[in-house]
Design a protein with these regions (language model features):
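ATP-binding N-terminal substructure of ATP-dependent carboxylate-amine bond-forming enzymes
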Residues: 1-68
């Protein structure tokens, strides 16, 4: 399952870290992310408040789930 996590704070970092441990998770993406998150997920420069941008990114990446 490919997942996009939206946000770049400590909560999102913890979510990404735990998701990265799961064998059920394929590709892991985050927007906007941060330096720590980028160790576990590919990060993109789309603001969490840019709803249209996040939707477009999710469609482009063809993710199975978005965690906000």
């Amino acid at each position: 399952m490919d997942i996009l996590v939206v946000g770049g704070g400590g909560r999102e970092h913890a979510i990404v870290m735990k998701l990265a441990e799961s064998p059920k998770v394929g590709k892991l993406y985050c927007t906007p992310g941060n330096g720590g998150i980028s160790r576990y997920a590919e990060c993109f420069d789309v603001a969490a408040t840019d709803i249209e941008g996040v939707v477009a990114l999710a469609k482009k990446l063809k993710v199975d789930m978005v965690a906000v």
